[in-house]
């Protein structure tokens, strides 16, 4: 989280500022992430880029603000986040979203392998520490994939084990080949 708004997101995710991300209403939290992305893109000249690869884009914002414990039963935020980020802030619209699909247990185990992060140290962030959030997030990504054809689900598990980086990369290459031709 290198921008002003990114640092604020980091404080909310760590709880270090006295307010925790899971205590903030879902639209306000979505706005913090959108402002971070807006700030990151506003001065970036990507006009001559053939491919723009971005980690944790708008889908992540919509997913995680829609699956928090406090927001279960509230309206889904996908349409709000699309309007906010693409139409209002005019950040680049994704031609494709790649979702690396794995079982929630492995996803949770991977949180512990992230190592030191400036905003939380070695600990999981507020969302990563919430019980069942990986399971609900996975379900929400699958739901969004049914609504948006530009979402590509890449199966990363085989017989309950994570596939190799090479095998996952080959699946991504195959999935994106028609877009890059």
Regions found by a protein language model. Name each.
Residues 12, 35, 56, 100-101, ...:
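Conserved catalytic core of Hanks-type protein kinase domains
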Residues 1-3, 58-59, 102-108, 159:
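Conserved nucleotide-binding/hydrolysis micro-motifs of P-loop NTPases
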Residues 53-55, 100-101, 152-155:
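Short beta-strand segments at enzyme active-site cores
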